[in-house]
Amino acid sequence: MKKGLFFVALMIGAMGVKAQVNIQEMYDFNRGHLTTTLEMFKGDKWGSTFFFNDIYHPFDMNVPSEYYTEISRAINFWQGTKLAPLSLHVEWNGGNFASNSWLFGVEYFLHSSDYSKRLTFQLMYKEISHIVVHLVDYIPLQFTMVWGVDNLMGVKGLQFSGFLDVWGSGDTWVNPLVDPTDPVETTHWVMLAEPQLWYNIGQHFNCGQLSIGGEVEMSYNFTGGWHATTNFYENKGFNVAPCLGLKWNF
């Protein structure tokens, strides 16, 4: 799951530019596969729209095996007032391995005077529609923090961005290789964070759209990833998954 464009998008929207699109290709060292991510943001006078789509490419399969999508709308038709940093937020996310979810809430955006440092907080009600796993007494809330810093430590073209999600869950962990109906353990909270570091290497050869970098996916009891359909146990507890890749800004 990626939200790296979100803060850049907020900056772009605030500066009057209408849209931004990028594509990323990452190699996941833990899972041993490539992930293609497409991100898009569009700002308007009523707020902004953001989406991304992750597509997983296991090397032992001839076609992409799994996908995950998030699309969100920030509603803010009071831009230019003292309440401009505060927006309403509505979001849908899901995929062919993940449960569909609707989220409703608010977000608050902070930034430096030149928008080179950005931070947003979101608090949302989350409604999960589970298909494979079951829900048992969960708190239907999600807290999200997203950040972005341009020219990190004074290095031109070095960007540090990422997000942290914490949400209530009622997942009953099962092992489909043994018995899909056998409940093993219930988790009530899930955490996912993906700090990213990108360097605009293309600035050195007249190709400013190209960046090189990567991310570290840090999670707790997160069932995401194409391998979740074969082994739910793999992501129980705390896990770290480093990734390396390229990004192209259109």
Question: Could you tell me what each predicted segment is?
Answer:
Residues 22-28, 32-77, 81, 85-89:
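Transmembrane beta-barrel domains of Gram-negative outer membranes and organellar outer membranes
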Residues 15-19:
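Sec/Tat signal peptide C-region and signal peptidase I cleavage site
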Residues 32-36, 63-69, 98-104, 137-143, ...:
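Residues that define the transmembrane beta-barrel architecture of outer-membrane proteins
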Residues 25-31, 55-59, 90-96, 123-129, ...:
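Transmembrane beta-strands of outer-membrane beta-barrel pores
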Residues 131-225, 248-250:
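Outer-membrane beta-barrel transmembrane domain signature
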Residues 38-42, 71-75, 104-110, 123-125, ...:
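Residues on the lipid-exposed face of transmembrane beta-strands in outer-membrane beta-barrel proteins
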Residues 4-13:
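Sec-dependent N-terminal signal peptides
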Residues 46-48, 76-87, 111-120, 150-160, ...:
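Short loop/turn motifs that connect adjacent beta-strands in outer-membrane beta-barrel proteins
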